[in-house]
Every structure is written in structure tokens, then in C-alpha cells.
């Protein structure tokens, strides 16, 4: 206390902290000790022998949910605890369900593999290159077959360039038949004024290109009887509009018509010699 002359002021000073304090404890005032914390039980992994697994799989094939009596009987047989048998069946059922879920995926993958193999085989048969193969590999099976079929359908198969005529008696019938099949009847059409188109065709002859030029009507008859080129020859025989001029038929592409140079077309003149019109 502080005293003055007239009054006394009480002291504000506090006494020291001198009473004992117990240490912090966790369990009823006992000091903290790590050994007093309850330890979590560790799971023990069980290793099964091959014989034990065979017995368990046999029972699982019979039933997935064995009763307690079956589990105890198997536990005595394989010398394990009944709780271990129960845990094994629980894990085995989970594995079985997972396998059942994966079955549709595997079946789909197998079907896709079969489809891809079939598609590759059809691509090879169609003449298309295999997937993943070299880009330069281009089989020509399909194109060759299509070209052959198209040629047969259109009748454009190539014919031999030279067919030697056979004059023997044994081959007369066959040669006449082939000539009759390849020969066409002459078709005369009138195209325009004074223009006659004569289309003639006959059998194929090896000497058609090198045929000699006939000079008389008898030689023309003999030549016409012989087979000529298979392609149709168009002859444009223009009559002499002005007979007094006289057209030179020997300059035509077909020399067999040279006879007409001696016998011009007997046409009627358009005017008389004195210059008067008709």
C-alpha cells in the first residue's frame, strides 16, 4: 500500500503465480503415452495352396452362397478358418460378376475382328488393295475381268488380221459358213440429189489391202466374188450432171468403178448447145 499524508491508496501489484499446475493428460489424469493409443488391427493375407483352390472352386461351381455348415466342412478339410472361407467366397463372387460384365465387350471385339477379316478378304477378291498394305500394290484382277466381259458383251473381240483362204474340199463348208456369217447384204440408199451410197461388205481377206486393180467387167465380177475387207466401204457414185464434161472415174478411191469412165451417165443436159435453157 502507498500511504500519503491524508489517505492511503491500495497497491495494484499482484502476487506471483506460485500454485502448481498439473500437466496436460489425455486419459484420466495419466501422462500422455503413445503406447496407450489403440492399434488398428492389420489384415493378414492368406495364401492358398493349389489343392485348397481346387476344393474351393469345386464348391463355388456347386453354389456361390454356401451355408455355414458347408463352409465349416470345407474349412476342416483344407485346415483354414471358416471366416477365411467366407471372405474367399465373397471375393470370388465379385470376380465372377466382373467377368460377366466383360463378356459382351469381348464378344463385340471378336465379332469386329471377324468382320474386319471378312472385309479384307472381300477387298482382295474385288481387286482393292489391303488396308495397311503398300500403296503401290494395285491388283488388276477386277479390271481385266471387266474388260473381258465388256468385250464379249459388245462383240468387239479382236479378230486375226490374216486368215488364209482354204480351197480344199474338206474345209469348203466351214469357209462358206464363216463367209456367210460375216457377209452383209448391200444396202443402197439415195442421199440427196444425184448421190447414190452403196455399202458393201464381205468376209475378211488377207489380201484385201494388196488387191490388184481389175480393168474389165469380168475382173470386177471375179473380184466381187472374192472376200474383201470386213469394214463397210462407202462408195459415192456421183452421176455426170454435165455429160459433155466427162468425169474421170479412174480417180475414185475404188478402182473397180473405172468402167464408168467409158460409159458416162446418160443425163439430160440443162441447156442446148446454142445457149438456150430448157
From Swiss-Prot:
PANTHER family: HOMEOBOX PROTEIN (PTHR45793), HOMEOBOX PROTEIN CEH-37 (PTHR45793:SF27)
Biased amino acid composition, Basic and acidic residues: 98-118
Pfam family, one: Homeodomain
CDD domains reported for this sequence: homeodomain
Biased segments, Low complexity type: 168-180, 205-228
Expressed in which tissues: Broadly expressed during early embryonic development. During later embryonic stages, expression is detected in AWB olfactory sensory neurons but is absent from there by early L1 larval stages. Expression in non-neuronal cells including the excretory cell and intestine is maintained through adult stages.
GO BP terms: neuron fate specification; olfactory behavior; regulation of DNA-templated transcription; regulation of transcription by RNA polymerase II; telomere capping; telomere maintenance; telomere organization
Organism name: Caenorhabditis elegans
Protein name: Homeobox protein ceh-37
Amino acid at each position: 500500500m502507498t500511504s500519503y499524508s491524508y489517505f492511503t491508496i491500495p497497491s495494484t501489484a499482484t502476487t506471483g503465480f506460485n500454485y502448481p499446475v498439473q500437466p496436460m493428460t489425455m486419459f484420466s489424469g495419466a501422462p500422455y503415452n503413445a503406447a496407450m493409443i489403440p492399434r488398428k488391427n492389420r489384415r493378414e493375407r492368406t495364401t492358398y495352396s493349389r489343392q485348397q483352390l481346387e476344393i474351393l472352386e469345386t464348391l463355388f461351381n456347386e453354389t456361390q452362397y454356401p451355408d455355414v455348415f458347408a463352409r465349416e466342412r470345407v474349412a476342416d478339410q483344407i485346415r483354414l478358418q471358416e471366416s477365411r472361407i467366407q471372405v474367399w467366397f465373397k471375393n470370388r463372387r465379385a470376380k465372377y460378376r466382373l467377368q460377366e460384365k466383360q463378356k459382351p465387350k469381348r464378344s463385340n471385339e471378336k465379332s469386329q475382328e471377324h468382320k474386319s477379316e471378312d472385309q479384307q478378304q472381300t477387298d482382295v477378291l474385288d481387286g482393292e488393295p489391303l488396308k495397311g498394305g503398300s500403296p503401290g500394290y494395285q491388283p488388276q484382277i477386277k479390271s481385266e475381268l471387266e474388260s473381258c466381259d465388256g468385250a464379249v458383251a459388245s462383240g468387239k473381240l479382236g479378230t486375226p488380221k490374216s486368215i488364209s483362204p482354204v480351197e480344199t474340199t474338206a474345209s469348203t463348208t466351214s469357209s462358206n459358213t464363216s463367209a456367210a456369217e460375216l457377209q452383209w447384204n448391200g444396202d443402197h440408199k439415195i442421199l440427196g440429189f444425184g448421190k447414190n451410197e452403196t455399202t458393201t461388205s464381205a468376209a475378211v481377206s488377207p489380201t484385201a489391202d494388196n488387191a490388184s486393180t481389175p480393168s474389165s467387167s469380168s475382173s470386177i465380177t471375179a473380184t466381187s466374188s472374192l472376200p474383201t475387207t470386213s469394214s463397210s466401204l462407202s462408195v459415192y457414185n456421183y452421176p455426170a450432171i454435165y455429160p459433155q464434161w466427162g468425169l474421170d472415174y479412174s480417180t475414185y478411191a475404188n478402182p473397180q468403178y473405172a468402167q464408168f469412165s467409158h460409159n458416162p451417165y446418160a443425163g439430160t443436159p440443162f441447156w442446148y448447145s446454142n445457149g438456150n435453157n430448157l
